[in-house]
Protein backbone atom coordinates (compact mmCIF):
# COMPACT_ATOMS: atom_id res chain seq x y z
CA UNK A 1 0.00 0.00 0.00
CA UNK A 2 1.15 3.49 -0.81
CA UNK A 3 1.64 5.64 2.28
CA UNK A 4 1.24 8.97 0.48
CA UNK A 5 -1.81 10.24 -1.36
CA UNK A 6 -1.51 11.40 -4.97
CA UNK A 7 -0.16 14.95 -5.23
CA UNK A 8 -2.07 17.60 -7.16
CA UNK A 9 -0.56 19.20 -10.23
CA UNK A 10 0.43 22.85 -10.10
CA UNK A 11 -1.26 25.20 -12.55
CA UNK A 12 1.25 28.04 -12.30
CA UNK A 13 4.71 26.61 -13.01
CA UNK A 14 5.84 28.59 -16.05
CA UNK A 15 7.27 31.99 -16.96
CA UNK A 16 7.87 33.75 -20.26
CA UNK A 17 11.17 35.28 -21.30
CA UNK A 18 11.61 39.06 -21.02
CA UNK A 19 10.80 41.03 -24.18
CA UNK A 20 14.01 43.16 -24.21
CA UNK A 21 12.13 46.47 -24.23
CA UNK A 22 13.55 49.87 -23.29
CA UNK A 23 15.83 52.64 -24.48
CA UNK A 24 18.55 51.31 -26.80
CA UNK A 25 20.37 54.59 -27.55
CA UNK A 26 21.02 57.16 -24.82
CA UNK A 27 20.71 60.97 -24.97
CA UNK A 28 23.61 62.41 -27.00
CA UNK A 29 24.51 59.08 -28.61
CA UNK A 30 25.35 58.96 -32.34
CA UNK A 31 22.89 57.09 -34.61
CA UNK A 32 22.62 56.25 -38.30
CA UNK A 33 19.38 55.78 -40.29
CA UNK A 34 17.55 52.64 -39.18
CA UNK A 35 19.10 52.46 -35.70
CA UNK A 36 16.53 51.52 -33.05
CA UNK A 37 16.35 54.15 -30.31
CA UNK A 38 13.47 52.82 -28.14
CA UNK A 39 11.55 49.53 -28.04
CA UNK A 40 8.25 49.90 -26.18
CA UNK A 41 4.66 48.72 -25.72
CA UNK A 42 2.47 51.68 -26.68
CA UNK A 43 3.87 55.20 -27.03
CA UNK A 44 5.41 55.79 -23.60
CA UNK A 45 7.91 57.93 -25.51
CA UNK A 46 6.58 59.86 -28.51
CA UNK A 47 8.42 60.33 -31.82
CA UNK A 48 9.76 63.81 -32.60
CA UNK A 49 11.78 65.14 -35.53
CA UNK A 50 13.86 62.84 -37.75
CA UNK A 51 12.58 59.64 -36.13
CA UNK A 52 10.08 57.04 -37.33
CA UNK A 53 7.49 54.96 -35.47
CA UNK A 54 7.14 51.26 -36.28
CA UNK A 55 3.90 49.30 -36.09
CA UNK A 56 5.01 47.86 -32.73
CA UNK A 57 5.72 51.44 -31.50
CA UNK A 58 9.49 51.07 -31.96
CA UNK A 59 11.16 54.46 -32.45
CA UNK A 60 14.03 54.48 -34.97
CA UNK A 61 16.36 57.05 -36.55
CA UNK A 62 15.61 58.42 -40.03
CA UNK A 63 18.83 60.46 -40.38
CA UNK A 64 22.41 60.41 -39.11
CA UNK A 65 22.85 62.47 -35.97
CA UNK A 66 22.63 62.61 -32.17
CA UNK A 67 19.73 61.39 -30.02
CA UNK A 68 17.90 64.00 -27.93
CA UNK A 69 15.27 63.22 -25.26
CA UNK A 70 13.01 65.99 -23.94
CA UNK A 71 9.71 66.48 -22.13
CA UNK A 72 6.99 68.74 -23.53
CA UNK A 73 3.57 69.08 -21.87
CA UNK A 74 4.10 65.87 -19.84
CA UNK A 75 5.05 63.89 -22.96
CA UNK A 76 8.49 62.34 -23.35
CA UNK A 77 9.73 62.98 -26.90
CA UNK A 78 12.80 61.72 -28.74
CA UNK A 79 14.42 63.60 -31.65
CA UNK A 80 17.52 63.08 -33.75
CA UNK A 81 19.54 66.28 -34.17
CA UNK A 82 21.50 66.57 -37.40
CA UNK A 83 25.24 67.00 -36.84
CA UNK A 84 26.56 70.20 -38.45
CA UNK A 85 28.85 69.39 -41.38
CA UNK A 86 32.55 69.95 -40.62
CA UNK A 87 33.67 70.85 -44.13
From Swiss-Prot:
Molecular function GO labels: structural constituent of ribosome
Q: Which InterPro entries match?
A: Ribosomal_bL27, Ribosomal_bL27_CS
Task: State the superkingdom.
Answer: Bacteria
Its GO biological process annotations read: translation
Q: Which keywords annotate this record?
A: Ribonucleoprotein, Ribosomal protein
Task: List the GO cellular component terms.
Answer: ribonucleoprotein complex; ribosome
Q: Where is this region: Disordered?
A: 1-24
State a single Pfam family of this protein.
Ribosomal_L27
Give the UniProt family note.
Belongs to the bacterial ribosomal protein bL27 family.
- Protein's name according to its UniProt entry: Large ribosomal subunit protein bL27
> Quick one: which gene encodes this?
rpmA
Amino acid sequence: MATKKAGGSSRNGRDSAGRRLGVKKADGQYVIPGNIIVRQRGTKIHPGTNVGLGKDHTIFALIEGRVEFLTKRNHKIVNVKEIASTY
